[in-house]
Structure formats: C-alpha cells, structure tokens
A protein has these predicted regions:
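Residue-level recognition of single "structural anchor" positions
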Residues: 1-171
Length: 171
C-alpha cells in the first residue's frame, strides 16, 4: 500500500486464532515498534511455512527496512521460519530473534480491535470470506491508527473522505 509511512527496524510477529466453520484458522500479523501494521497473512494451518510466508510478504516491499530484531511469542513455528528465511536470504543473518511473551503486548493489544469485530460477526463460514473480511478490517484499522500518509489519526471526516476517494463511493 503506497499510502503508508515508513517503518522502524524492530518487527513483532504474532498469530491469532479465528474460528471458521467450527474449525480454526490462523491469522499472522506483523507490526513495527510504534505499532504500525506492516502486513498480515491468513493461513489454514499454524506452521513454520505460514510464518515464513508472512515474513517474506512483510519484507518484500522495499519501503520496509530489514529488521534488526524480531520479537515473537514462544510459538514453535517462529525459530524454524526465521532460520529458513536467513538461509534463503530474505532476512539478514545478524537479525536477532527474541522469543519473549511480554515484548508482544503491543501486538496482542492490536489484535483486540480485529477480534472484537470478528466476535460481533459471530465468526465465519468459509476461509475465503474470512480472509477478505479481515483484510477489510485491517485496512480500516490502519486508517484509524493514522498510518495513512494524508489522513490524521483523529480526523474522522478526513478518514471518511479518504475511504470514499479510494473506493469511489458517493459522498
């Protein structure tokens, strides 16, 4: 998204469980040290491949700097994903991994607004529908957090005008 600001060199990654048709899905999210959302990745399974895909997707944009530190919780999928990403050259070899739960508190709090909307919707019936809907939630959440270059954080009128302009809606 070319409307966003640049990011800092500390990245936090976490996953959240979303119920889809009585089964579960996992949505991986990455934020920087100032709680700006970098990217998210939906996955049917919680695995190292999904965590690696999030990392590759988050670092694919040249406007995102290579992180010096990646904070994650103690999930077993992250060390393998980070090791493979370093081997493939997606991630610098000097990047540190800090698997400490409390360092992800900002990200856990950031999940709250998305999870609140999911609970209000009473969960999803199909994975594709969940992916598209949560993608919309994430974009609106970015706009509300002030991550869009031309829209201030508390300016609701400007946020509405921006959404109307981007989606071509009548005002």
């Amino acid at each position: 998204m070319d409307f966003c600001f640049s990011y800092t060199s500390i990245l936090a990654g976490d996953e959240t469980y979303v119920r889809v048709k009585a089964a579960g899905s996992t949505f991986y999210r990455a934020i920087d040290s100032v709680a700006a959302t970098i990217d998210f990745f939906p996955s049917v399974f919680r695995s190292a491949d999904a965590a690696k895909a999030l990392l590759a997707k988050a670092l694919a944009d040249p406007s995102h700097p290579q992180p010096r530190v990646i904070n994650t919780d103690k999930a077993k999928c992250y060390p393998a994903a980070l090791h493979e990403s370093k081997e493939e050259g997606v991630l610098r070899r000097r990047c540190r991994h800090r698997p400490v739960q409390y360092l992800n508190n900002i990200l856990e709090q950031d999940h709250r607004s998305i999870k609140k909307r999911i609970r209000a919707k009473q969960h999803f019936r199909q994975f594709g529908c969940a992916r598209r809907t949560i993608q919309g939630y994430e974009v609106i959440h970015r706009i509300r957090k002030g991550q869009v270059r031309w829209v201030k954080k508390g300016d609701v009128l400007a946020q509405n005008q921006f959404i109307n302009r981007v989606f071509g809606l009548a005002a």
